Amino acid sequence: MIEQTTIALLSGGIDSATAACIAMEAGQKVIGLSFDYGQRHLKELQAAADLAKNLNLEDHITIKIDLSSWGGSSLTDTSQAIPTKGIQKNTIPNTYVPGRNTIFVAIGLSLAEARGANRIALGINAMDYSGYPDCRPDYLKAYQELANLSSRVGREGKGIKLWAPLLDWEKTKIFEEALRLKIPIEKTWSCYQGESKPCGRCDSCRIRDKALKEIGREDLCSQNI
């Protein structure tokens, strides 16, 4: 059996860590790919490095891209406040970073083709995407078509698969799977704020804490990290 390789976009959060571990459990070699894009929550990069070491990934690469130079998001522009009043339906919050996932996946495709990887693992999740346009099934489908058209391996019929195993999972299921896979959840980072401790108020903290409470793991909620 030929050993296959997955490029896992590793943010330092629970979703990307779980996707990477599912790939490893399936027998794939996993290379982690993280990005320093000028985000205020730089602590996620340390979480990604810690996870890569803890999970014994084949390799872990961090790319620097300064998306903060033109702003457009409260994650890259500290003059904008992070929303803390809960998720607003039917709106895209200012934590959306213009083009972020599109850029990340493009770099992932380049790395995958160069390293001979057969797929890219994405931790995107449509159930709690907070309105982000680049975490939806139609986005993934369209990007897969582009990936097939824009790469040599795609033209040769051996395209790199954009694989999002958690796309339609509830957050509770993701945490249950993370526990089964023995992922050190306490080492993951979800908070949007650039503070030493999770704020417990941003959308990401709220989604995380709600799911953990529902599965009876309040010990892993933001106030306990």
Curated annotation (Swiss-Prot):
<feature type="binding site">
    <location>
        <begin position="10"/>
        <end position="20"/>
    </location>
    <ligand>
        <name>ATP</name>
    </ligand>
</feature>
<dbReference type="InterPro" id="IPR018317">
    <property type="entry name" value="QueC"/>
</dbReference>
<feature type="binding site">
    <location>
        <position position="202"/>
    </location>
    <ligand>
        <name>Zn(2+)</name>
    </ligand>
</feature>
<keyword id="KW-0547">Nucleotide-binding</keyword>
<comment type="function">
    <text>Catalyzes the ATP-dependent conversion of 7-carboxy-7-deazaguanine (CDG) to 7-cyano-7-deazaguanine (preQ(0)).</text>
</comment>
<dbReference type="GO" id="GO:0008616">
    <property type="term" value="P:queuosine biosynthetic process"/>
</dbReference>
<keyword id="KW-0862">Zinc</keyword>
<keyword id="KW-0479">Metal-binding</keyword>
<keyword id="KW-0671">Queuosine biosynthesis</keyword>
<dbReference type="GO" id="GO:0016879">
    <property type="term" value="F:ligase activity, forming carbon-nitrogen bonds"/>
</dbReference>
<dbReference type="InterPro" id="IPR014729">
    <property type="entry name" value="Rossmann-like_a/b/a_fold"/>
</dbReference>
<keyword id="KW-0067">ATP-binding</keyword>
<keyword id="KW-0436">Ligase</keyword>
<protein>
    <recommendedName>
        <fullName>7-cyano-7-deazaguanine synthase</fullName>
        <ecNumber>6.3.4.20</ecNumber>
    </recommendedName>
</protein>
<dbReference type="Pfam" id="PF06508">
    <property type="entry name" value="QueC"/>
</dbReference>
<comment type="similarity">
    <text>Belongs to the QueC family.</text>
</comment>
<dbReference type="GO" id="GO:0008270">
    <property type="term" value="F:zinc ion binding"/>
</dbReference>
<feature type="binding site">
    <location>
        <position position="191"/>
    </location>
    <ligand>
        <name>Zn(2+)</name>
    </ligand>
</feature>
<comment type="pathway">
    <text>Purine metabolism; 7-cyano-7-deazaguanine biosynthesis.</text>
</comment>
<dbReference type="GO" id="GO:0005524">
    <property type="term" value="F:ATP binding"/>
</dbReference>
<feature type="binding site">
    <location>
        <position position="199"/>
    </location>
    <ligand>
        <name>Zn(2+)</name>
    </ligand>
</feature>
<feature type="binding site">
    <location>
        <position position="205"/>
    </location>
    <ligand>
        <name>Zn(2+)</name>
    </ligand>
</feature>
